[in-house]
Curated annotation (Swiss-Prot):
<dbReference type="InterPro" id="IPR020016">
    <property type="entry name" value="Decahaem-assoc_OM_MtrB/PioB"/>
</dbReference>
<keyword id="KW-0472">Membrane</keyword>
<protein>
    <recommendedName>
        <fullName>Outer membrane protein MtrB</fullName>
    </recommendedName>
</protein>
<keyword id="KW-0998">Cell outer membrane</keyword>
<feature type="signal peptide">
    <location>
        <begin position="1"/>
        <end position="21"/>
    </location>
</feature>
<keyword id="KW-0732">Signal</keyword>
<dbReference type="GO" id="GO:0009279">
    <property type="term" value="C:cell outer membrane"/>
</dbReference>
<dbReference type="Pfam" id="PF11854">
    <property type="entry name" value="MtrB_PioB"/>
</dbReference>
<dbReference type="InterPro" id="IPR036942">
    <property type="entry name" value="TonB_rcpt_b-brl_sf"/>
</dbReference>
Length: 695
């Protein structure tokens, strides 16, 4: 009897009982040497070809008084248009292409195009735009904003204080503090034989705009609009080899950053003081580059997974130094900075039994600053400078070691825990070595049909080598001061989460977290910090067409700090309280008007508040900082035809903040020329009409 092995036969063999497989009759033992697999075909399989998806266009009207609202609405233009698309083309023999666009034409728009042959190669082209708006009400007396040379009016009259400058208020012009980024990328992936594959991608980011800066002469300062015109070119390439239970990959990452401007020149608005200077310069972000090469691999059998990665790289910058206004000889025209990087990651996961899994990892990262040390003469202003100084080549080495166990006690009940160790070694710091030891455990129960809950606790300690005042700052800091990132610390943390679905259409989720950082040996500095947060979420499918959801998040961080006004024991105590409340709700109704209309409403409210009190004999309040924002989005979508849908969105944002750093008049501080009041208090609205068409 002749027996032909076909797809149906294979399916039957694959579902044969374990008893047959155990006796050597499993599918793995089938003799397939004479089977002509190249002649196999699936006559019942139909591969759909052609184009499918949706495309859409939209136009919106933006009524805004404060440009900050563009962060929420995605555009700063009064009238804005957008293009959306999700289109896929499938051809014969595995050829495929896709186009995805989201709000293209607006500040947060993005586009991604892919084309290739499935399982062989793919070409990717992508574009994304990101914008961040700060203020359009900043004021400055300078001309040349956006360039590297800021000048005052020709008839400017200097004075000893900003309030005495006769032409200041009449010379003010408004400017926009915002940053825009455009990213364009190109990538190629190729799958060779079954053993190897390769990829290469390139991305260019162009960042433009204005950001805050300041220039000073002795104790006088002017707020300046720093021009931003950055270009960053990034490239990534790699090759991957793989087998049945292993793979290895070699990758390269490179980044080259260029700044169109290397310095910002500006006039002084004040009477000449130290050095009788009437103009100055500040250095801007220097050109730099970074290159890394990494080798990684993984081995996986039925019991163990071993993975490793080795990385080496270098960061460098050789920008010419800005020497304008510096009256001494410089030891070198450019710093020629170099930082070498080495990284190593090892990890193993072992399945000891069906119920027990063990894991361990080791991470090593070394940052070696090989910049040449030079001797520099400081400009003399007070008793802590005017001396010879040296650039400090900071090095850092970090090691992390983790072990963990994951044990399934019974079905729906699991216990896991572990131990984490971290060591950081630094030079030219108040403390050369810090060690952190942390133990943690978590217990999870999801054996109940409608409940899923877990609780986790951890305790950690940080200590290290002897704390010594740095020779670079010893004359300027209290010997009792302990920097919070280097000081001894005990950390206790507890968190839990409960998810309950009493009925199929209702889900309730609640989580809480508490963390206490106790800086036990600190006399001057941060002595204690508490972080408490909790959140609640509810989602309810009221009917098949009506869905409602709501959430609430709360966090409060309380910190205590001790200080001294006489370089000795504590004379004052500071208390800082930061709170954040976020609440939101949404409702959507589908299948109205004969299953053609969907309507919805989303609302969120956020309130962040910060308050600082200082006690030194009497209690002084620095005043609250707060930011409050309401966001509403009302929308409706109507299915006009089988393929065409119309959508209407109405968005509102009400925002108000109180920040002492922004709430200052241009001449509000005698020795500062500021940007004026840049606090926010506005209500903005946006209407968007859009249409989508199904191809």
């Amino acid at each position: 009897m002749k027996f032909k092995l076909n797809l149906i036969t294979l399916a039957l063999l694959a579902n044969t009982g374990f008893a047959i497989a155990a006796d050597g009759y499993g599918l793995a033992n089938a003799n397939t040497e004479k089977v002509k697999m190249s002649a196999w075909s699936c006559k019942g399989c139909v591969v759909e070809t052609g184009t499918s998806g949706t495309v859409g266009v939209g136009v919106g009207y933006n009524s805004e008084e404060d440009i900050r609202s563009a962060n929420a609405f995605g555009t700063s233009n009064e009238v804005a248009g957008k293009l959306d698309a999700d289109v896929t083309f499938r051809g014969e023999k595995g050829y495929r292409a896709s186009v995805e666009a989201y709000q293209l034409g607006m500040d947060g728009g993005r586009l991604e195009v892919n084309a290739g042959k499935q399982g062989q190669y793919n070409v990717n082209v992508n574009y994304r735009q990101i914008a961040t708006y700060n203020s359009n009400s900043a004021l400055t007396p300078y001309s040349g904003v956006g360039s590297d040379n800021l000048t005052l009016p020709d008839n400017w009259v200097t004075a000893g204080s900003s309030s005495q400058m006769p032409l200041l208020m009449d010379s003010l012009n408004s400017l926009e503090l915002s940053l825009k980024r455009e990213r364009t990328g190109l990538g190629f992936d190729y799958q060779g034989e079954s053993l190897w594959s390769t990829h290469v991608s390139y991305m260019r980011e162009e960042k433009t705009g204005l950001k805050k800066a300041s220039g000073g002469f002795f104790n006088q300062s002017m707020m300046l609009a720093e021009p931003v015109d950055y270009t960053t070119d990034s490239i990534e390439a790699g090759i991957k080899l793989k087998g049945d239970n292993w793979f290895t990959a070699l990758n390269y990452n490179g980044s080259i950053f260029k700044n169109e401007y290397n310095q910002l020149n500006f006039d002084s608005a004040f009477n000449p003081t130290f050095g009788a200077q009437t103009s100055g310069s500040i250095a801007l972000d220097p050109d730099n580059q970074s290159h890394t090469v990494s080798l990684m691999g993984q081995y996986n059998d039925s019991t163990n997974v071993l993975s490793a990665r080795l990385l080496t790289g270098q960061m460098s910058q050789d920008q010419a130094l800005v020497t304008s206004g510096y009256g001494y000889q410089v030891p070198t025209e450019a710093l020629d900075a170099k930082v070498d990087l080495i990284g190593l990651n090892l990890k193993v996961v072992s399945k000891v039994t069906n119920s027990l899994r063990l894991s361990g990892s080791y991470d090593y990262n070394d940052r070696d600053n090989n910049t040449q040390i030079e001797e520099w003469t400081q400009v003399s202003i007070n008793n802590v400078n005017g001396k010879v100084a040296y650039n400090t080549p900071y090095d850092n080495t970090s090691q992390r070691f983790k072990v963990a166990a994951d044990y399934r006690i019974t079905r729906g009940m699991k216990l896991d825990g572990g131990y984490d160790f971290r060591r950081d070694e630094r030079n030219y710091q108040d403390r050369e070595t810090t060690d952190e030891n942390t133990v943690w455990a978590r217990f999870r129960v999801n054996s109940f049909e409608t409940w899923d809950m877990w609780v986790k606790g951890s305790y950690g300690q940080r200590d290290g080598s002897e704390y010594q005042a740095s020779e670079w700052t010893s004359s300027e800091t209290n010997s009792l001061l302990r920097k919070y990132n280097l000081a001894n610390r005990d950390r206790t943390q507890v968190e839990a989460r409960v998810t309950h679905s009493p009925i199929e259409s209702l889900t309730i989720d609640f989580g809480a977290r508490y963390a206490l950082d106790d800086y036990t040996d600190t006399v001057i500095g941060l002595t204690e910090s508490k972080d408490t947060s909790y959140d609640a979420n509810i989602s309810y499918m009221i009917t098949d067409d009506l869905l409602a959801n709501a959430f609430y998040n709360y966090q409060i961080i309380e910190s205590e700090q001790a200080g001294s006004s006489n370089y000795s024991t504590p004379t004052w105590t500071g208390f800082i309280e930061d709170k954040v409340d976020v609440v939101g709700a949404g409702i959507s109704y589908n299948n109205l008007l004969e299953n053609k209309l969907r309507m919805g409403l989303d609302y969120t409210y956020s309130d962040s508040n910060s308050n600082t009190q200082v006690r030194q004999g009497i209690t002084g309040d620095y005043g609250d900082y707060f930011a409050k924002v309401h966001n509403i989005n009302l929308y409706a979508q109507y299915q006009a035809t089988e393929k065409m849908a119309l959508r209407f969105d109405y968005k509102i944002e009400n925002y108000k903040d109180n920040d002492a750093a922004n709430d200052i008049a241009v001449n509000g501080i005698w020795n500062v020329v500021g940007f004026g009041d840049n606090s926010h208090d506005y209500t903005a609205q946006m209407i968007m009409l859009s249409m989508s068409y199904k191809i």
